């Protein structure tokens, strides 16, 4: 039974990943209202698929570089005081919330930290263009020219 379940999950993940991989290249395209076309909308996928897709993007970023990605998760940051840099990220847990993946983002325009950012753990929706950069000899990925909205909490 476990083998069947594992095989089913792998097949569904592969199908979802290949469906995303054949999206038309439209990183600079715009819809009729002038909005950037979203190449991959992770905010509409299940936790397992999102976690798998983000892992795939981090493992093999080449097909996704320059593409517009939208993702929902929760906000977190890292204040690197040694280098004077604050890194902002959209964190995505897997379906069981035991493991997390995250992608750093850089908001478009001028923003001040912490005034222009939500509290840690706030539910956010981030849309930006996936790019890579090098820092201290290591290649990292981030969403640039990003827009972030804070999702309202249900009370």
Can you annotate each of these PLM segments?
Residues 6-7, 19-155:
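OB-fold and OB-like single-stranded nucleic-acid-recognition modules
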């Amino acid at each position: 039974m476990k083998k069947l379940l594992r095989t089913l999950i792998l097949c569904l993940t592969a199908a979802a990943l290949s469906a995303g991989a054949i999206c038309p290249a439209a990183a600079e395209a715009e819809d009729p209202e002038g909005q950037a076309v979203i190449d991959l909308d992770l905010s509409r996928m299940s936790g397992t698929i999102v976690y798998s897709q983000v892992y795939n993007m981090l493992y093999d970023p080449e097909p996704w570089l320059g593409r517009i990605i939208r993702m929902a998760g929760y906000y977190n940051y890292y204040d690197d005081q040694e280098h004077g840099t604050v890194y902002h990220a959209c964190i995505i847990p897997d379906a069981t919330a035991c493991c997390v993946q995250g992608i750093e983002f850089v908001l478009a325009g001028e923003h001040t930290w912490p005034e222009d950012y939500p509290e840690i753990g706030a539910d956010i929706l981030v849309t930006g263009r996936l790019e890579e950069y090098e820092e201290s000899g290591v290649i990292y990925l981030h969403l640039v020219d990003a827009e972030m909205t804070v999702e309202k909490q249900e009370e």
